[in-house]
């Protein structure tokens, strides 16, 4: 199944919120997210089954903290193969709503990935600058294979010429929060993904 195209948001159906008035609209419901993750899990399992049998090694999921933590947890459960986790923290965001393009490592991997089948798991790819840097960095560590899975992809990412093997949803350029994505460390705990009311980040 192809990438789901999301072109517009809907008004929240349930007004009772953890953050009253902050969410302008719901872009992806919890049900839509989980259904797509189930599809991604099956696709990834099909693609890596032979490699796992050949190497005898589990698929290594490298997760970029913090936004992708909820996604990778659900994704791992949806992949019908054994997986292992590694965490990396890189930063190109401040307290703004756009990527700065300046990348720095906040936390590196705890193990050698040489000879491993590696799947980078991202929450959202917007400019593609951070992901492009990450791919270059990890490729120097000589994994057996290196691919990317992102839950969300924004239009500008297509111009970055970054190969993304698995995409959950193509979304507009809106600044989104929820399901692990934050603004100033808030809203990660929402079960859905929504657009933030501009008044929140224009204060």
UniProtKB/Swiss-Prot annotation:
It comes from the Bacteria. The active site is at 126 (proton acceptor). GMP binds at residues 154, 175-176, 182. It is an enzyme of class 2 (transferase). PROSITE patterns: PUR_PYR_PR_TRANSFER. GO terms for molecular function: guanine phosphoribosyltransferase activity; hypoxanthine phosphoribosyltransferase activity; magnesium ion binding; nucleotide binding. Its cofactor is Mg(2+). Belongs to the purine/pyrimidine phosphoribosyltransferase family. This is Hypoxanthine-guanine phosphoribosyltransferase.
């Amino acid at each position: 199944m192809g990438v789901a195209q999301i072109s517009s948001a809907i008004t929240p159906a349930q007004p009772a919120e953890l953050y009253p008035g902050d969410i302008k609209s719901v872009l992806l419901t919890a049900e839509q997210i989980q259904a797509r993750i189930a599809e991604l899990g099956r696709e990834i399992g099909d693609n890596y089954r032979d490699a796992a049998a050949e190497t005898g090694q589990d698929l290594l999921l490298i997760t970029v903290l913090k936004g992708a933590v909820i996604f990778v947890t659900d994704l791992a459960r949806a992949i019908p193969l054994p997986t292992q986790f590694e965490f990396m923290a890189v930063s190109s965001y401040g307290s703004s709503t756009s990527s700065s393009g300046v990348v720095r490592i906040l936390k590196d991997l705890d193990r050698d990935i040489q000879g491993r089948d590696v799947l980078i798991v991202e929450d959202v790819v917007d400019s593609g600058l951070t992901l492009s840097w990450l791919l270059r960095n990890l490729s120097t560590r000589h994994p057996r294979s290196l691919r990317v899975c992102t839950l969300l992809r924004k239009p500008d990412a297509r111009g970055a010429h970054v190969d993304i093997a698995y995409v959950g949803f193509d979304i507009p350029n809106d600044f989104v929060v929820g399901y692990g994505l934050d603004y100033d460390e808030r809203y990660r705990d929402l079960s859905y993904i929504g657009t933030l009311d501009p008044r929140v980040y224009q204060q």
